[in-house]
Amino acid sequence: MVSIRLPDGSVRQYEHPVTVAEVAASIGPGLAKAALGGKLDGELVDTSTVIDRDAALAIITDKDADGLDIIRHSTAHLLAYAVKELYPDAQVTIGPVIDNGFYYDFSYNRPFTPEDLEKIEKRMQEIAKKDEPVTRRVVSRDEAAGYFRSIGEKYKAEIIESIPQTDEIKLYSHGGFTDLCRGPHVPSTGKLKVFKLMKVAGAYWRGDSKNEQLQRIYGTAWTKKEDQDQYLHMLEEAEKRDHRKLGKQLDLFHMQEESPGMVFWHPKGWALWQQVEQYMRRRVNDAGYLEIKTPMIMDRSLWEASGHWQNYRENMFTTESEKRDYAIKPMNCPGHVQVFKHGLRSYRDLPLRYAEFGSCHRNEASGALHGLMRVRGFVQDDAHIFCTEEQFIAESIAFNTLAMSVYKDFGFEHIDIKLSLRPEQRAGTDETWDRAEQGLRDALTACGLSWEELPGEGAFYGPKIEYHIKDALGRSWQCGTLQLDMVLPERLGAEYVAEDNSRRRPVMLHRAIVGSMERFLGILIEHHAGAMPAWLAPFQAVVLNIAESQAEYAHSLTQTLQKQGVRVAGDLRNEKISYKIREHTLEKVPYLLVVGDKERDAQTVAVRARGGVDLGVMPIEAFVERLQEDLRSFK
């Protein structure tokens, strides 16, 4: 007798072992038809999986997130099937699920073209319509490796050799195609109805640039056409908002081959940067942080003591001078510990909060670089809090409050919080981890925040809170972190004198709100589609004269506004006013101030807000008051 416990708490009993599909059919024909897989005692399995013991089972359909993953994974295999039918000489490698879709890497003797993608997608649709059953079988390692070698699939054979001896080797087949996979997969290809191939990109075998270059075909798959249409529309909108395009259009920054991964900031872009940095500086100063500055280049011995030289060297830029090895700092933490150590610290000095807009460099692979989002040289709004164990919850509460307020000011209302918990390999005792993890939970609870827990995802030196902001397109970006560190103070010898005159290690909290300034500015540009709120905009207003006769008044007006702290420019060019208005509208300036003879004579301005909104004619004082009202909440 086999007892199956369902999600609603009910128990069904079967006299013999049953498959997931049979359980679904016993519940109802509709569920049997909709079933894509099952979750057996928490593990995803195929509908063909036989259950021969008492277990908990949930039937997975396309209404479940796991169901969508199964569809995407199966569609990746459908892609490989179609490629092998159309291009038999192509070799298949791997095809995982990624955010919003999947990819599959191929080795082929020529580049795939857009026309190839159209043919492949059409063949995928044809195979899906055949509704071919997908079957799974478990085989020996030798049988699997021998099979793939016999059909010339050397990459699959290599993957099999790297699979742990304790793992099962599963082969999935549909039609004439067999692939190696952990699964699970849909029961038949007819379940795959909504998909689209997106693009081809280069990729290295096993992600190593020393290996062969492959071709990666990206695709997306969904349960409903409306969802795919919505996703494709979002991609179109994202293309319009691409910070690289807007950076050029708005004359904010550029990048060039002579300095890969580094940014050349133009005056308008640097003005935007300064607004963000000055705002962040105000906020951390008000929160009791002390701003410091640490060296960009430090001796190898410090990086060895911190552990970075042994564990992070391949990502560090190094140099040598007078027979000494140095590294350009990839992060600020070791330098902040040096400041803390400089002098005897007492428990009365704690908490100490050191902040730095620290310039860091990391030797990212050239293929991973992406505009402002992935660079080699960047500035972090970095800070480290040194406190006692009794103080760290209060410090965490204060940081949560500060971070959420900052995100709101920048226009981000939806923040997802994730708490990464202890990994298997870790420093410190279980009791220390218990206190650390519960302390971060208590801090989040005290702030009225909800969070998702990620078991095993913490760093070996402590648990971490991550702050993921959602932009206007619904995309999630991890920006902020609050990382508890149980190791670095010990490694670098940081200590303070406790109340009982003993020497103790401080608790160290690494924290950032925006993270990389470059990346955050890229996110901001895309979130606002380049139309920055007035408090951030490089220019808050531009004064435009209609004819030469108003040039003197327009110039005087510009100077008056500048003296009142308005970021304003004057456009006195001898061009048609319609041309000038259009140009500055495309530059997304918040306010255009137009002056003609009437405005000059009455000492007024005609105000146009962004979006072509006509605010009418008003005295300059009234405009300044309106602008100040816009800015008041950020002063």
UniProtKB/Swiss-Prot annotation:
EC number: 6.1.1.3
Annotated compartments: Cytoplasm
Top EC class for this record: ligase
Cofactor notes: Binds 1 zinc ion per subunit.
MF terms (GO), sorted A to Z: ATP binding; metal ion binding; threonine-tRNA ligase activity; tRNA binding
Catalytic activity: tRNA(Thr) + L-threonine + ATP = L-threonyl-tRNA(Thr) + AMP + diphosphate + H(+)
Sequence ranges assigned to domain TGS in this UniProt record: 1-61
GO cellular component: a single term: cytosol
Swiss-Prot/TrEMBL cofactor(s): Zn(2+)
UniProt keyword list: Aminoacyl-tRNA synthetase, ATP-binding, Cytoplasm, Ligase, Metal-binding, Nucleotide-binding, Protein biosynthesis, RNA-binding, tRNA-binding, Zinc
Region (Catalytic): 242-533
Gene3D superfamilies noted in UniProt: 3.10.20.30, 3.30.54.20, Anticodon-binding domain, Bira Bifunctional Protein, Domain 2, Threonyl-trna Synthetase, Chain A, domain 2
Gene Ontology BP term (one): threonyl-tRNA aminoacylation
Subunit structure: Homodimer.
Family according to the record: Belongs to the class-II aminoacyl-tRNA synthetase family.
Alphabetized NCBIfam families for the sequence: thrS
Function summary: Catalyzes the attachment of threonine to tRNA(Thr) in a two-step reaction: L-threonine is first activated by ATP to form Thr-AMP and then transferred to the acceptor end of tRNA(Thr). Also edits incorrectly charged L-seryl-tRNA(Thr).
Protein name: Threonine--tRNA ligase
